[in-house]
A protein has these predicted regions:
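Extracytoplasmic/periplasmic ligand-capture domains
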Residues: 1-28, 32-33, 37, 42-183
Length: 183
């Protein structure tokens, strides 16, 4: 899990995704490829560059970032190893209540194209929420979009864990840390 704390790893994984293609296949071209900001439309107090941060499709750039982290395919199987030699395999559990399966499959393929292995598994919504609540997900797989009026009337979207039980809560440990006053 340490690798997820590295901004270059997260950026590499982001720019390895072809959001335009994913929009066409998974959302019938109806979406707007962007980074999640929590707001739509973006309010004046939010920096517009947040919507496009690390959203360009750049597999060569992703490969360069991963190379720079010392993640290399040392055994020739097409999958990168971590600097300590361990394989990195991302478990992509998802529920179709939160995201379409083909979207998850596309993400897995884009990441495979830059040497990151993953296992895609559909689970029930209850299994997903249980794993999410207990911080057992490698990657949060959930589509997200909220109109500004809902965001402004719902502080759950602005405070860790950034949602309620029925949404995509992606900061459970941070919320626990805040609730415990840092202990």
């Amino acid at each position: 899990r340490e690798v997820f704390g590295n901004i270059d790893f997260r950026r590499a994984m982001s720019i390895a995704i072809n959001r335009s293609e994913m929009n066409e296949i998974g959302f019938f071209g109806q979406g707007t490829p962007r980074a999640y900001t929590g707001f739509s439309p973006l309010p004046a107090f939010a920096d517009a560059s947040m919507e496009t941060y690390a959203t360009e499709y750049d597999p060569a750039g992703a490969n360069a970032l991963l190379d720079g982290l010392g993640m290399a395919d040392t055994d020739g199987d097409g999958i990168r190893e971590l600097p300590n030699g361990d394989k990195l395999v991302l478990n992509l559990n998802f529920s179709t209540q939160g995201i379409a399966g083909q979207t998850v499959e596309l993400a897995a393929q884009y990441w495979r194209d830059v040497g990151i292995a993953s296992v895609v598994k559909e689970v029930t919504p209850d299994e997903y929420r249980s794993a999410q609540s207990s911080n057992k997900l490698d990657v949060s797989m959930w589509r997200k979009g909220q109109p500004l009026a809902i965001v402004l009337g719902n502080n759950e979207l602005l405070v860790p864990p950034y949602e309620n039980y029925f949404g995509n809560r992606n900061a459970m440990l941070w919320a626990e840390w805040i609730a415990s006053n840092g202990s």
